[in-house]
Amino acid sequence: NPKKRVYVVEGPIDSLFLKNSVAMVGAGALKEIPKRLENTPMSYILDNEPRNRQICSYIEKLIELGGDVCIWPDIIPEKDINDLAYRMSTRRIQKMIDENTFNGLEATLRFREWRKV
């Protein structure tokens, strides 16, 4: 539903656990998804891999573009939504993502604390 916030996740399986979500597949997704969902509020949820240079690069780029990005809290050891679903309800996952989604300066500060690269 493009009238509601769309959750852009890294993989197709992750998209099964969130309402109104779409999987970011392929290198062009960072440019194509915003074009297709113009004027739609979006949150980007990438995998919880603070040592992965590619993920860190994507997050940094999304923040620079003014995107809303989920910065995983330190208490979450799981790598992605799929893994998290084994121990947490989808409602709780959605709430946690909403509470840890930031943009602008706050996103930059949280990202710097989160990344390990």
Indicate residue ranges for each PLM-predicted region.
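TOPRIM fold recognition
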Residues: K3-V6, P12-V117
